[in-house]
Amino acid sequence: MLYNIARPLLFSLDPETAHELSLAALHFFGRVLPAATPTESDPVDVMGLHFPNRIGLAAGLDKNGEAIDGLARLGFGFLEIGTITPRPQPGNPRPRMFRLPEVRAIINRMGFNNHGVDALVANVRAAKYRGILGINIGKNFDTPIDRAADDYLACLDKVYALASYVTVNISSPNTKNLRQLQGESELDDLLGRLKARQQQLADRHGRYVPLTLKIAPDLEPAQVTNIADALRRHRIDGVIATNTTIARDKVQGVRYAEQQGGLSGAPVFEASTAVVAQLSRALAGELPIIAAGGILDGRGARAKLAAGASLVQVYSGLIYRGPSLIAECVRATTDFADSGHAATSASFGA
């Protein structure tokens, strides 16, 4: 209800300004209110972690972990913050975020703007939240692609003790050449080094923190199969499908469609769900899938589970629907496995 009142004001502002105001409000309420208790509804165990419900926040909304406690009050089963890089960086010049309300979409070319991993670590330490927290890591824009692994390892070292799981983001279209890391040889090298460091850190801290990989929707079937093979080969703990798309076929003729950057929201739903389904078939249950991309209602969340996901994440849908989307998705995915109405993954992207 409150969001329905606030939305016209927020939509009258530049999208990034509205984003900053929303984060500031969440930060304020998180500080002045007591710690939130996660909403328990059909809890599920995934990657050795206990999720109170299947609905999470996707990375990108709170890059620096500044509003963790406020976000925790919205009913999520888990939060993912970031993407964070080893050193602070400003990202791309403004304007770099655009609303496409006719199709309930967003285009962004933020470019991993963030305050650096040390600032995020300080914010996480200061937070009251004790639920499941994923931390999404990336590389600095000026780090050569052949040295990208060094940036991921530097971030992993610093966030490991604080994260419930760590996501390796190799799929943003807004960092030059980043998606090259989805290539077969590049991915093998990166995952091999990350897995070795994960084991070292687990021994050092006495705690195993799962690693997930976030991939793009703009992949050929053979590429998805190769990625699935690499995930199994390196015993990665999970995969997030998907990031934003560079495709524009669903938004032709829409204002701002020509803007460079990643497209999220409703137009990416079909392609993203097809990747989830293909991963599900290729992985055959060997590791869990966290689905993100175009979830605007409870039916969308259920469709992701039907395609083979264990958990789902939302972000762009929050911009158009507000926090009520979270409760709707939680209700829609409760008792999903026992509902008897689930489609099989063969229904998507066959």
Curated annotation (Swiss-Prot):
It comes from the Bacteria. It is found in: Cell membrane. Binds 1 FMN per subunit. It is a peripheral membrane protein. Keywords: Cell membrane, Flavoprotein, FMN, Membrane, Oxidoreductase, Pyrimidine biosynthesis. Pathway: Pyrimidine metabolism; UMP biosynthesis via de novo pathway; orotate from (S)-dihydroorotate (quinone route): step 1/1. PROSITE patterns: DHODEHASE_1, DHODEHASE_2. It catalyses: (S)-dihydroorotate + a quinone = orotate + a quinol. Monomer. This is Dihydroorotate dehydrogenase (quinone). The gene is pyrD.
